[in-house]
Amino acid sequence: LDNEKIIWAFVPILIMVGLIFTQPNLSMVLLLLATSVAIYICAGGSIQLILYGMCTMIPLLLLKGLKGYQSSRITTWLHPEADPLGAGYNIIQSLVAFASGGLYGVGYGSSKQKLAWLPEAHTDFIYAVIGEEHGFIGCLLIICLFWTILQRGFLIAVKCQDMYGKLLALGLTFSICFQGFLNMWVASSFVPATGVPMPFISYGGWFFFFFFFFVL
């Protein structure tokens, strides 16, 4: 790929990222950048160039770009037990939901955590509710469903004859699956809280139809 064309292609993306970052909405910034990088790499772009950019941007973001509450999210993620009734409450209750579910779960609609203890049970922590009601088996099924979407989307991209269609299929597939897996990682305490809901499953009118439009 022509490096000059690459730079110009990333200019509008970086402008959008900058505007979103000032809101601030770091989770949407992460999603937009991750999807753009995935499309760039699949188009034959240089992974080395991406690594250089990450080595430059990540330290700057950590040192200067994070707001107080965003830094607090990282600290809470590392040590939720330090403030179990405050900042660490959400993630602790999420893990309690998973533990309560065990292998097979407590049954559909029988979650106790979602009734009073687990905040945002219908959006950010819907995966924890699934874990409590349907257990490890239910969680594994959700992973398999998103993995199937990922596999089928990439297969469509491979079979596509033109580059635009190929990259469009890759971008939409990556965007859906990245959000899905990111939601799972947050609920499981593998990454700090991001506020990203799970496609097709989390509550939300336009959000729900938006992703079905992606699939169509």
Language-model segments: which ranges?
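P-loop potassium selectivity filter motif centered on the GYG triad
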Residues: 1, 99-107, 199, 207
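Hydrophobic alpha-helical transmembrane segments of multi-pass inner membrane proteins, especially
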Residues: 1-90, 128-188, 212-213
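Short conserved micro-motifs on helix faces and helix-strand junctions that flank
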Residues: 22, 85, 102, 116, ...
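Re-entrant/interfacial helical elements at transmembrane boundaries that shape
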Residues: 31-32, 110-114, 145, 188-197
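TM-adjacent membrane-interface loops and short helices in multi-pass inner/ER membrane proteins
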Residues: 76, 80-123, 127, 134-138
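Residue-level recognition of specific faces of alpha-helices
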Residues: 97, 114-117, 146, 156, ...
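A juxtamembrane structural motif centered on a specific transmembrane helix
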Residues: 181-216
